[in-house]
């Protein structure tokens, strides 16, 4: 078994923020077989492994990673009826575009997310009121402890706001995911994609070196009634959001006057306070 594993590979060029040290070992797994065998290789040598997608939600330590970093580069996307099955390394914008061409709606909101299918499922990525978990029908993942490939239903994935079972169990490596979409006309789907894109350009730091929203919004139900009232009294700008599920972190940071605040080359966007950019 020959695996194209490299040594001492810089990770900074492989992340949006362009920071971080080197990986002791690195492999770009172009096939599912290489992906599985590379994890087996890491376990054989008692090395930790880390799955790196598009690098859009990763901060790499300057100390690097003293194990094996595996980048899934297998990215096949198939359609059967209203179902779309995408491998872990497929980019979300490409999946959204192909779904549009197939006349399948549901992924329009994801057309501007700079991540992979695997990463999107792991973090239950979402925006504009939609989430990856809302569409997922099932997925396949490799259990590196048992050495088996397991199938997960939507319920098995334990989706919640920006969470899934896969964030809590790093031994599970996502291989592919199947999504249930709705039939629609490509022109109508494209209009919605254009509308979402326009909203992004208007409100977000598009084009900057950034990875989207940094912090999760704060759920109201995570605090007591009294604490909630104190916050509303202290920050009157939050009153329009008191009946919503979350407190927008961008509004909190903006209220604190942190838009444009910087340390070194890292800066809080002047356009959207939950976007951190590199100047």
Regions found by a protein language model. Name each.
Residues 6-7, 15, 58, 149-279:
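Phosphate/pyrophosphate- and phosphate-bearing ligand-binding catalytic cores of soluble enzymes
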Residues 1-128:
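Anion-binding (especially nucleotide phosphate/pyrophosphate-binding) glycine-rich loop
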Residues 92, 96, 110, 114, ...:
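Hydrophobic, well-ordered secondary-structure segments
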Residues 26, 85, 138-140, 174-178:
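Beta-strand secondary-structure signal
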Residues 62, 80-81, 143-148, 183, ...:
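Short acidic-glycine loop/turn motifs at beta-strand connectors
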Residues 77-79, 141, 215:
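A structural signal for short hydrophobic beta-strand segments in well-ordered beta-sheet cores
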Residues 122-126, 134-144, 148-165:
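Active-site glycine-rich loop that binds ribose-phosphate moieties when present
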């Amino acid at each position: 078994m020959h695996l194209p594993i490299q040594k001492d590979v810089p990770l900074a060029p492989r992340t949006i923020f362009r920071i971080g040290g080197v990986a002791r070992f690195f492999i770009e797994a172009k096939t599912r077989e290489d992906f599985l065998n590379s994890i087996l290789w890491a376990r054989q040598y008692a090395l930790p492994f880390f799955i790196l997608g598009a690098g859009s939600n990763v901060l790499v330590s300057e100390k690097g990673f003293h194990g094996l970093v595996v980048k899934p580069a297998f990215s096949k996307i198939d359609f059967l009826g209203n179902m779309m099955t995408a491998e872990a390394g497929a980019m979300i914008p490409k999946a959204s575009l192909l779904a549009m061409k197939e006349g399948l709606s549901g992924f329009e909101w994801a057309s501007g997310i700079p991540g992979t299918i695997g990463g999107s499922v792991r973090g239950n990525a979402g925006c504009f009121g939609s989430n990856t978990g809302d569409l997922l029908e099932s997925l396949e993942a490799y259990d590196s402890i048992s050495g088996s490939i397991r199938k997960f239903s939507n319920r098995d994935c334990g989706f919640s706001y920006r969470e899934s079972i896969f964030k809590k169990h790093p031994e599970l490596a996502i291989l592919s995911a199947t999504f249930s979409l709705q039939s629609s006309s490509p022109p109508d789907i494209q209009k919605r994609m254009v509308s979402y894109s326009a909203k992004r350009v208007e409100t977000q730091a598009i084009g900057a070196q950034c990875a989207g929203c940094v912090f999760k919004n704060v759920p109201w139900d995570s605090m007591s009634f009294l604490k909630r009232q104190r916050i509303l009294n202290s920050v009157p700008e939050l009153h329009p959001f008191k009946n919503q599920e979350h407190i927008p972190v961008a509004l909190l940071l903006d209220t604190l006057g942190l838009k444009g605040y910087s340390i070194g080359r890292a800066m809080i966007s002047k356009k959207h306070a939950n976007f951190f950019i590199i100047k």
